[in-house]
Amino acid sequence: MIHRFSLTVQLQRPWIAWALPQFRRQKRRSQGNQLSGYRLLSQSSARTRDEPEIFRGNLNVPVANCSEKYFDSQPKAELKLKEYLQYMKQKDRQDTLYLKDWHFHAAQRLQQPADPPVYRTPCLFASDWLNEFWEEQPELRDDFRFVYVGVAGTWTPFHADVFRSFSWSANVCGRKRWILLPPGEEEKLRSLSQLPFDVAGVLGAESPSAAVSSATLPAGVSVARLQPKTSPGGVRYFDVIQEAGEVMFVPSDWHHQVWNLRDTISINHNWLNAANVGHASRHLLASLTAVKAELADIADGSGAWLAQCQQLLKATHGMDVREFVELLCFAADRRLDGARGAAAVRGLDGWQHSRDHLRWDLARVRCVLRRLLALEDVTRAPDMDECLARAQRVIADIEEVCPPEAGGAPGPGQCDCGVCA
């Protein structure tokens, strides 16, 4: 069955917000600018201000061409927002263009820092170490909060999310089809070590007609009880429709492919927290192992070679070892004062965390850091001295606030962080 959201339960199944009765009740009451009980546009944005400058069309936005393939992705170019909106109005389109991975929130902060955000992250997804980390580094002008705008027929190839993070996707309008594979099922699809670019044909699921939607579920049937389909080749997968106003949650390690069945606007976040930081740790270390194998023919164990490994890891994985340790230390430092009772700690977009929540976060940070710092691949990474000293200090501070013997950290056999033995 689909688990409720909990800091102490690892989320194992994808779900759509309409699976939860309170979301269904709120959805019936809500209007077009509300999302599962959470208003996407603030009162001031919706009613009292002129159209934000960010919507006027002069910004450059990333646009993918879904009609072409470039290695294992779709080629991208930059257009003005107004050019893409004009494209959407065309009746005879030559290519299928998809505005995707637009750092909308970062763009708004840069262009209109005094304005309130256009939307607020739902509280279920507000424990977000990844975006908290990037929010405190505005000079990077980066984050993992995206807006997607696509005409009917646009799609995203088969993939798993960056860093093996969680992701959530909220349909402001439109309709999406999702095919999702439980972890490990994707291995049945590998050919010469490669995964398929487009999974629908491989699964024999070209038509969306058999996909499950909240609009077509019989009365009394819960989405939490849905069972996966099985392809002719024995691959288990879920095939679901996401309607306007619904939120899709995708757990770590679930490969998926997504199509826009109608013109669609969605808000999408990738995020890490205590529940999946072990997946992220394991994937980072596996990616580093793969990088070292690629550079094995020039391996000499020198500092220069180790630096090359980290540079390639950053280029292919999106994050190197030092940055990951810094993220963990950042998350811990923010939570230590709150766990001591000295100050309230707020997550993404102002949501406040409980004391128990903070202690759980700290316990997981301690566990992952302790294991990482025991690995030579981490301690011998270049430019790590200051970072390692900070990590040791964080571990000591956490053990002072959350002593393991007092239940502040998982004991033997209790940790499922992904890097513990």
What are the residue ranges of the model-derived segments?
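Short, charged beta-turn/beta-strand-edge "cap" motif at the junction between a beta-strand
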Residues: 254-256
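N-terminal accessory scaffold of Fe(II)-dependent oxygenases
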Residues: 1-247, 259-421
